[in-house]
């Protein structure tokens, strides 16, 4: 009985192990870093507008994100799948955010806060 339990446990644990490489439909790290940087710029720009209601700001942020995704030939579902994948793989996410920071630093030096 104990051998069967150990065998089942080993089988289960080996089945849980997954390939950590991104699936084909996931946005590549470099492009994801640009998209995330754009999203941060969009959100930061709108957080400065205090005259707007929260609902209005949310609608505008979502619209600007959709425009940005369209410009980069990405849809929101693919972005969300990619973000979910990367957020569950800390090594990838750390590399992406290092690139996000570099991207934002370059924009700051150029005073290019548009993001779009």
Model-found features: residue ranges?
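Hydrophobic/aromatic beta-strand elements that line small-molecule binding cavities or substrate pockets
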Residues: 33
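C-terminal motif of bacterial Sec signal peptides marking the signal peptidase cleavage site
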Residues: 12-15
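Compact alpha-helical subdomains of small soluble proteins
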Residues: 51-116
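Conserved active-site segments centered on acidic
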Residues: 36
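A ubiquitous short alpha-helical element
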Residues: 27, 48-53
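Bacterial Sec signal peptide processing site at the extreme N-terminus
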Residues: 17-30
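Sec-dependent signal peptide recognition
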Residues: 2-8
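N-terminal alpha-helical signal peptides/signal-anchor transmembrane segments
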Residues: 39-43
């Amino acid at each position: 009985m104990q051998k069967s339990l150990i065998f089942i446990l080993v089988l289960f644990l080996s089945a849980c192990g997954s390939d950590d490489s991104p699936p084909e439909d996931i946005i590549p790290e470099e492009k994801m870093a640009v998209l995330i940087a754009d999203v941060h710029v969009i959100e930061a720009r709108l957080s400065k507008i205090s005259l707007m209601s929260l609902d209005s700001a949310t609608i505008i942020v979502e619209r600007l994100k959709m425009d940005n995704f369209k410009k980069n030939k990405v849809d929101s579902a693919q972005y969300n799948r990619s973000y979910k994948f990367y957020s569950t793989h800390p090594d990838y996410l750390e590399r992406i955010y290092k690139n996000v920071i570099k991207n934002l630093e370059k924009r700051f030096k150029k005073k290019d806060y548009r993001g779009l």
